[in-house]
Amino acid sequence: MENKPSVLTERYEVGRLLGQGTFAKVYFGRSNHTNESVAIKMIDKDKVMRVGLSQQIKREISVMRIAKHPNVVELYEVMATKSRIYFVIEYCKGGELFNKVAKGKLKEDVAWKYFYQLISAVDFCHSRGVYHRDIKPENLLLDDNDNLKVSDFGLSALADCKRQDGLLHTTCGTPAYVAPEVINRKGYEGTKADIWSCGVVLFVLLAGYLPFHDTNLMEMYRKIGKADFKCPSWFAPEVKRLLCKMLDPNHETRITIAKIKESSWFRKGLHLKQKKMEKMEKQQVREATNPMEAGGSGQNENGENHEPPRLATLNAFDIIALSTGFGLAGLFGDVYDKRESRFASQKPASEIISKLVEVAKCLKLKIRKQGAGLFKLERVKEGKNGILTMDAEIFQVTPTFHLVEVKKCNGDTMEYQKLVEEDLRPALADIVWVWQGEKEKEEQLLQDEQGEQEPS
């Protein structure tokens, strides 16, 4: 393949080589518009055409566009020149799960987390008629938050690839992870073949080695055909039972994903995950509301009294600085940035803070206290232009009147506007007196404030 371009269509800077295969190389890239990190898969057209794999490339594109899930590597766009095809995909900073397993077996709770995310992704793909057919740790990537991402759909199949008997017939996958019915070159169900591979992955995560391994390939196939494997002594009984059902050589009696989710080991991990999330949410609430709740004094860990941080106040000059004139713009202005939203509230600061924490929890947003009256709100899932983050800051105009500004810090502006309009506005209705842009209420608000400020 010829030398890589340093810039791709003036949209992406192309950096270091991340990996390569027979027909493609993957490079680190960065968007010139958003500064977002991406991976750029460069495929040699001539090589692909020469061996008749053009349909496979088209299928991979179709599959990745269908399989949009938090635990599946996202395809951002596809471009082509005379000699190359470019996939711009999600960059997974953590690399392959294989590299982590190569260092030894994982702790059970860590293995459960990855297995849970793998099953979630595979179940979603199956619901969209997509079968991966090459599930292995080398094709499971980790993002910078240590979340698993299923990648490499080059050997995947769509439901319309089945023959009249309703089965798939192409032998695909890596030998050590392939189901017996695939090796036997008989028709097979894509769902059951993927479940077998997931079972092998689970074994590898917990054991640190393969369940079926032999220097002689035919002997390894024999072991796979008979499900001839032994679980190490440190495997929990619930794990052993689940693995025996996933690595059932009879695909007709092999466990389904629905039953995997009902298994005791899967549910036990889910229960622990729920408890951990609840603990984190409580911690977030404590961090967000303490010690700012009522504006009174609090105590530190030693029982000593201390003054809580105070909200930023707005004087007449601050209000004018926020404005485009001396009218109601003292609070909002007729022209405002699409990346900012403001509302006025007649509720005390403690009630506004409590409501922000409650709404963040309902909308599954992370919330962190940044300072006096300043909170960082963050979406868990990465959006089109990265993770959406916002600052919510409370300003005191008078003791009974506050201005709250919600400003986008990162992410997609359209996504921010949609969140504000469809989620935040309805959820915050109890504490809002007027939102920026609601003219009639703004005028009434201005009259009320002027009345309060007139000398007696």
Curated annotation (Swiss-Prot):
What is catalyzed by this enzyme?
L-seryl-[protein] + ATP = O-phospho-L-seryl-[protein] + ADP + H(+); L-threonyl-[protein] + ATP = O-phospho-L-threonyl-[protein] + ADP + H(+)
> InterPro entries given for it?
Kinase-like_dom_sf, NAF/FISL_domain, NAF_dom, Prot_kinase_dom, Protein_kinase_ATP_BS, Ser/Thr_kinase_AS
Annotated GO biological processes are:
signal transduction
SMART domains in the record: S_TKc
| Cofactor names | Mn(2+)
Q: Where is this region: PPI?
A: 338-367
Please give the Gene3D superfamilies that the UniProt record associates with this protein. Kinase associated domain 1, KA1, Transferase(Phosphotransferase) domain 1
What does the record give as EC number?
A: 2.7.11.1
Name of the molecule in the record: CBL-interacting serine/threonine-protein kinase 2
Question: Which species?
Answer: Arabidopsis thaliana
- Which gene name does the record give? CIPK2
